[in-house]
Amino acid sequence: MSRTAPSSLAPGQDLPDDVAYLLQRAVSGVLRAAQNGDLPLFAWTLGLPQDELLEVLAKLFPEVEPVEPLRDVQYQQLLALKPRDFQSMLRLLEQSRNPQLPERKIRWLAHAMTAACYGEHELWRDMGLGDMTDLARLMQVCFPPLYERQRIGQNWKQLLLSRLHDG
């Protein structure tokens, strides 16, 4: 029996409301954790170029005043703190993305999720989600091939790290 929910989305359609909400929670959770020192400082960038991070903030949190950009040299110093395997982990997620969903928003989620992988807690906690069912919902809808590979009792960080080191 397949664990993947049947898709009712047409290609390019926006995210389901619950997934859009969880994307906002994940991005804000990772940014908050980085600012509080619970994630490495690079996570505050989500590993994105500064103009794209500012776009993420404007699109996901339109009620918030526009964020003043850092000087480029400061932002580049933060990005330089990314772990060496960040891009490989990110690629694993992006290659598993649901092609029916908006590519840009799933890219943002993949960046937030990858940054959260460098925290010390379970992935859902490091992403600022309510519980592991929130993360399972994101994985099921946004990264179905990875959702299918998760074994009962295996946490999501274990799955991602094992896939990274196997591939």
Region annotations inferred by a language model:
Residues 2-160:
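Hydrophobic, aromatic-lined core segments that form the binding pocket/scaffold
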Residues 162-167:
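Cysteine-cluster motifs in flexible loop/terminal segments that predominantly coordinate metals
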